[in-house]
């Protein structure tokens, strides 16, 4: 396909249904399939509608959860042997100072959800995660939708299908897409806390999927819950993200 033909293709935004909790894996898998199938020219962009956050941990405990966007800043945490300083800048995270020296400082910077930097001896870590998902279970694609692309989408791991009406993919309205993109650009505002101590919940993703339990503690600043779940006949506290459970 010539460059002129590619430019003439009409591309619209579509919502793709994906496996909940696997939104980023679905995106990465789709990009690989597009490359293998030679269909990259049909697609302008694939995004997960969520905010990218940096989670910084020290000695096994979460210390900070910060936006990957915004002004450059250095974050220092005290690990097992001393201080590790992470720098968040231009959409990347790297180590600028560590008690471990060059071993950790020279680690490659990270910039994508799922990537992490670990200073093993000092037990400190920075990881990029997707937080405050606008539409859990969906990713967005700007593409010229045709039969070849539809077949590629449907055979991609963790991706199900586009939102359809009458058996045909339905493009999103431009104003809807702009609202979503603006939310991501500004930083998604956390939704109100919908859980309280004593709520009965069902786990909908992760290793405890389909287990039920009772909310013991709510941590709104981290968007996490401590849920008491019966495991092998014993009530066990399990820490879960808000997105991993639903009320019953």
From Swiss-Prot:
Q: What does this protein do?
A: Participates in transcription elongation, termination and antitermination.
Q: Name one Pfam family in it.
A: KOW
This protein's species is Aquifex aeolicus (strain VF5)
Assembly notes: Monomer. Homodimer.
According to UniProt, the name of this protein is Transcription termination/antitermination protein NusG
Entry similarity comment: Belongs to the NusG family.
- Output the SUPFAM superfamilies linked to this UniProt entry: N-utilization substance G protein NusG, insert domain, N-utilization substance G protein NusG, N-terminal domain, Translation proteins SH3-like domain
The family database entries (InterPro entries) matched by this protein are listed as: KOW, NGN, NGN-like_dom, NGN_dom_sf, NusG-like, NusG_2_sf, NusG_dom2, Rib_uL2_dom2
Q: Which intervals hold domain KOW? A: 197-227
Q: Which domain of life is it from?
A: Bacteria
Gene Ontology BP annotations? DNA-templated transcription termination; regulation of DNA-templated transcription elongation; transcription antitermination; transcription elongation-coupled chromatin remodeling
Q: In the UniProt entry, what is the domain comment? A: Contains an N-terminal RNP-like domain, a C-terminal element with a KOW sequence motif and a species-specific immunoglobulin-like fold.
Q: Which UniProt keywords apply?
A: Transcription, Transcription antitermination, Transcription regulation, Transcription termination
List, alphabetically, the GO terms of the cellular component aspect: cytosol
